A protein has these predicted regions:
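Structural signature of outer-membrane beta-barrel domains
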Residues: 74-78, 118-122, 179-181, 218-222, ...
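Flexible internal linker/loop segments at domain or repeat junctions
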Residues: 339-366
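Flexible, acidic glycine-rich loops studded with aromatic residues
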Residues: 360-369, 374-420, 425-429, 433-435
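Signature for the C-terminal beta-barrel architecture of outer-membrane proteins
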Residues: 28-32, 36-37, 168-172, 186, ...
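Outer-membrane beta-barrel proteins
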Residues: 57-59, 81-89, 101, 147-150, ...
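Outer-membrane beta-barrel "beta-signal"
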Residues: 373, 447-460
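N-terminal periplasmic/intermembrane-space "pro-region" immediately following the signal or transit peptide
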Residues: 2-106, 318-321, 325-326, 460
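Surface-exposed loop and membrane-interface regions of Gram-negative outer-membrane beta-barrel proteins
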Residues: 76-95, 105-160, 166-168, 179-193, ...
Length: 460
């Protein structure tokens, strides 16, 4: 205890002496030599305050955006059964160019503008028209002797949109935009054709946990035939998905379509879809099952009710996938279940034989039952300028849903690969063979045809 007290006393005395020395130093002005000793010259000055960064401006967002550039060159040939009018095969050499700019984000806003141009290269040996239309081809009456290849020359504003993302769960998009819903069975951009389908619309997307939803009001449909065949629209699209597990996803949808200049395609379609995937040993198994009902809307057509059933199962092992699929689109003898806004090229065969006058979408007055089998192989073969190869073979068997009549069959084959990270090449083939005979009272199926495509595509 005495030792601790002694130490405390010594510390206190030292502190007092230090204080006294400091006071004396303050009371007696030092001479210059003393000042030099007592004011060290190596004391660092305080750093200047860090300037506050200026808030980003709209100009910064525009300048910090990214260039959009796509070029797709394609050769397409069509050999269709000849008639008194259709006497020649069709060929088209076309080049599609898209050029645009997407801004960086500014206060949750992001803008995009894109132009699209489609040009023919060489002779115009093809017709542009709605299949089955009785009017002359849009590219000239003299082209009626050729099969239809719907890639008209066009230069247009493809997209002009503003997207606002107030938080991670919400996004709103207004303007001319691309709308792809699910597998594009009911709403898509028809991306296979050179002039894609876009929508003048206001759209809201919600993503909250396992729940996602999309709503869009569509004012105008910019279709694949240029402005001559666009649709004025007063349509509503609603799709909602709940995903409790990877093996099960439930989706509900309502598509209320009202087209001022296409009453035949005005309809309301609602339905449910279940899908999912899981592992069974070394195999991944995926499935889809869809039911929808379609009826007249706003009294634009006589009353009707038509059903759609669709389902598929895909098994994947290593680089191989096998899929079995069945679709049934009901027909009542006057009209069939239709999907006016779908990317229809992906369904009922790549030959597009069942694209009918009803708006140019795939349909058939007696309905279509389509049983198809697919084999997909993704070879591991890789070279510097050849990789990501993909080979797909598919077989379709078509019957009329209402009568059961044989409509025909089709083989589809596609091989594609990447040449660089931005350049790809694809070769595609479709052959539809119509049934040899039609039972009495059954609708006549479309004529036989064979199509070949060779495509180079560059995407920045």
């Amino acid at each position: 205890m005495d030792t601790r007290r002694g130490l405390l006393a010594s510390a206190a005395m030292a502190a007092m002496l230090a204080w006294a020395g400091g006071a004396a130093a303050q009371g007696t002005p030092p001479d210059s030599d003393q000042a030099a000793v007592e004011t060290p010259q190596d004391v660092e000055a305080l750093p200047d305050p860090v300037p506050v960064a200026a808030a980003p401006t709209i100009s910064d967002a525009i300048a910090g955006g990214r260039l959009l550039l796509e070029v797709r060159a394609r050769y397409e040939s069509v050999d269709q059964k000849k008639t008194a009018v259709l006497t020649e095969n069709g060929e088209a050499y076309t080049v599609r160019t898209r050029l645009g700019w997407e801004t960086a984000e500014w206060n949750g806003l992001r803008g995009l503008i894109e132009f699209e141009d489609v040009r023919q290269v060489g002779p115009e040996h093809y017709a542009v028209n709605v299949p089955g239309a009785l009017t002359p081809p849009l590219n000239g009456a003299d082209k009626a002797k050729y099969p239809i290849i719907n890639d008209p020359e066009v230069t247009e504003l493809n997209r002009l949109q503003l997207t606002w993302t107030p938080n991670a769960a919400l996004a709103f998009t207004a303007g001319r935009q691309r709308i792809l819903i699910d597998d594009q069975r009911f709403v898509g951009n028809v991306g296979w054709r050179q002039d894609e389908q876009t929508f003048d619309a206001v759209r809201a997307d919600l993503a909250f946990g396992r729940f996602k939803a999309t709503y869009a009001y569509v004012d105008h449909v910019n279709r694949i035939l240029g402005e001559m065949k666009d649709w004025d629209s007063d349509s509503h699209l609603l799709n909602a998905t709940w995903s409790p597990a990877e093996a099960f996803r439930l989706q509900g949808f309502v598509y209320a379509l009202d087209f001022g200049n296409s009453a035949a395609n005005t309809s309301i379609t609602s339905g449910l879809k279940a899908s999912g995937k899981t592992w069974v040993g070394l195999f991944q198994v995926a499935y889809n099952a869809t039911y929808a009902v379609q009826s007249d809307y706003r009294h634009a057509t006589p009353a009707y009710d038509l059903d759609y059933w669709g389902g598929d199962v895909t098994g994947t092992f290593d680089i191989y996938s096998v899929r079995a699929s069945y679709e049934s689109l009901e027909g009542n003898g006057v009209r069939g279940f239709s999907t006016p806004l779908a990317t229809t090229h992906a369904f009922q065969g790549w030959s597009d034989a069942f694209v009918m006058p009803l708006g140019g979408n795939k349909s058939f007055v007696d309905g279509i039952d389509d049983l198809n089998l697919s084999l997909n192989v993704k070879p591991r073969f890789r070279r510097t300028y050849f990789f990501n190869a993909d080979i797909l073979v598919r077989y379709h068997d078509f019957d009329a849903e209402r009568t059961g009549a044989d409509l025909g069959r089709e083989w589809d084959v596609q091989a594609q690969a990447a040449i660089t990270s931005k350049l790809s090449v694809a070769l595609k083939y479709a052959d539809f063979e119509r049934a040899a005979s039609v039972p009495p009272g059954a609708a006549t199926p479309p004529p036989s045809r064979t199509k070949v495509w060779f495509t180079f595509e560059y995407k920045l």
